[in-house]
């Protein structure tokens, strides 16, 4: 059975595991992919700690914020960092099987349809289970927050109501705040 790259889905060469070096560089900034040293059991326990510390990321799906850490003479590895990581990790869920694979495939299909998407990939836990990882576009290479507005902020809605809006409302907000409103609203309608 042939192995495929978790980033681009193309066949891997001899000696390559999970990623082509150039694909690792695209998503992780290094040809050597950082280790994801956790297992499913670790993630469940760590996620509970993150929830207790109230440093969770908003949204419907369970997710964790990661960053890459390195020590002298040690390979780079992902660590869970609360809100300020440069990556978001979405593990498998009991409720919806294969959710990471579905999300990654959906993003690949969107790219093929010429929709701009964030850098994303599948990645393996230490126990071999797949998770979805995406690079945050609201962080600098050093992890500093970049100012970005989202539709909740522009509409002055709390994030817990972000899934209780309409496309029409979003289009009106785009028309109100965009510097090129007609172009942006056309792009919005093409994406939805």
What are these regions (language model features)?
Residues 31-36, 41, 65-67, 170-185:
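A short, terminal or domain-edge coil/loop segment
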Residues 12, 158-161, 177, 181:
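Short secondary-structure junctions and interdomain/linker hinges
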């Amino acid at each position: 059975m042939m192995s495929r790259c978790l980033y681009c889905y193309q066949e891997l060469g001899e000696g390559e595991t999970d990623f082509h070096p150039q694909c690792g560089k695209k998503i992780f900034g290094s040809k050597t992919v950082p280790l994801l040293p956790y297992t499913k059991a670790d993630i469940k326990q760590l996620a509970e700690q993150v929830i207790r510390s109230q440093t969770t990321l908003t949204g419907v799906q369970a997710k964790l914020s990661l960053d890459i850490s390195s020590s002298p003479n040690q390979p780079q590895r992902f660590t869970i960092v609360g809100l300020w990581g440069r990556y978001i990790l979405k593990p498998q869920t009991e409720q919806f099987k294969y959710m990471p694979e579905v999300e990654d495939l959906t993003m690949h299909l969107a790219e093929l349809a010429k929709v701009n998407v964030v850098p994303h990939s599948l990645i393996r836990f230490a126990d071999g289970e797949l998770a979805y990882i995406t690079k945050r576009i609201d962080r600098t290479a050093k992890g500093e927050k970049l100012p970005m507005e989202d539709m909740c902020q522009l509409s002055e809605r709390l994030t817990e109501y972000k899934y209780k809006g309409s496309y029409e409302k979003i289009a009106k907000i785009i028309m109100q705040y965009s510097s090129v409103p007609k172009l942006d609203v056309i792009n919005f309608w093409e994406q939805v």
